[in-house]
Amino acid sequence: MANSPQAKKRARQNEARFQINKARRSRIRTFLRRVEEAIASGDKEAATAALRAAQPELMRGVTKGVFHKNTAARKMSRLAARVKVLG
């Protein structure tokens, strides 16, 4: 348990940041899931639109420190390759 005022404040800040990051991560995962669903349905136009919507969200997650930039780049690259293959 935090004893000093500073430690108590850090605990409060950590919890607040955790909740914010949790919401951001959930939002990004939702966008990525929409791309996955569009790919699974085989609809190239919907998949492309979903990918275009997901990319800025994922990059925003990088800017905010939720994801590492290489992780985001890898996810976008793999999704883009799968969308490109759709006929």
UniProtKB/Swiss-Prot annotation:
InterPro entries: Ribosomal_bS20, Ribosomal_bS20_sf. GO terms for biological process: translation. GO terms for molecular function: small ribosomal subunit rRNA binding; structural constituent of ribosome. Keywords: Ribonucleoprotein, Ribosomal protein, RNA-binding, rRNA-binding. GO terms for cellular component: small ribosomal subunit. Binds directly to 16S ribosomal RNA. PANTHER family: 30S RIBOSOMAL PROTEIN S20 (PTHR33398), SMALL RIBOSOMAL SUBUNIT PROTEIN BS20C (PTHR33398:SF1). Belongs to the bacterial ribosomal protein bS20 family. This is Small ribosomal subunit protein bS20.
